[in-house]
Amino acid sequence: LATFALSIESPAFLFKNQKIVYQENHPKAFYDSMAFWNDEEGIAIGDPTEDCMSIIITRDRGETWTKLSCDDLPKAREGEAAFAASDTNIAIVGDHTWVATGGMASRVLYSSDKGETWSVFETPIVQGKATTGMYSIDFYDEKMGFAIGGDYTKPNDTLANKIRTTDGGKTWQVVADGKGPGYRSCVQYIPNSNGK
């Protein structure tokens, strides 16, 4: 049995039980979310320390973690980051992985092969300020996904804060625009619900 804990600020530490298995001392290090594909392989994401999101991956039950090079990741936009609001910035279905970003730009990083290769998809969710964008993302299956967020400084705003996809994240549509709920930091599908 293993328990993992991820600290958010520099120095960023990732613990497996009580042992430090990853440490990052970059002054901009700030990790937001962690998830596992299976008993062997996992991923954690954080804000950019260079010109891409910070992504670390383990392939050995969390004993060691390797940070992906920005050469292998989509370039981050100015002011693009992620939110540590609910630990739901990462959605996993099988080998497929979606990472929600927010802030000045709010996009979805996507990998079909457990983090080996990455692409990026645009979203219509509210963005353009440090406090706006996706705060949470979930997928029911490889095609159907939902993301929610908004602006936590304007919790009652309901414009462009809820989006969904039916093509695996390639395209997104705003839903319930101008209707509740306002800002939210977590969304989850109920298993075996057909995504309803």
At which residue positions do the language-model features occur?
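Entry beta-strands of beta-propeller and related beta-repeat scaffolds
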Residues: L1-A2, E40-A44, H96-W98, K143-A147, ...
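Asp-box/BNR beta-propeller loop motif
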Residues: L6-H26, I55-A76, L109-Q127, D157-K179
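Short glycine/acidic-enriched loop and turn motifs that connect beta-strands
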Residues: I8-E9, P48-C52, M104-S106, Y152-P155
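Repeated scaffold domains used in trafficking and secretory/extracellular systems
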Residues: K28-A35, T131-S136, Y183-Q188
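Signature of short aromatic-glycine-proline-rich micro-motifs recurring in repeat-based ectodomains
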Residues: A82-I90, M134-S136
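Oxyanion-binding "anion nests"
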Residues: T132-R164
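Loop/turn-rich, solvent-exposed surfaces of beta-rich toroidal or solenoidal domains
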Residues: G150, N156, A176-K196
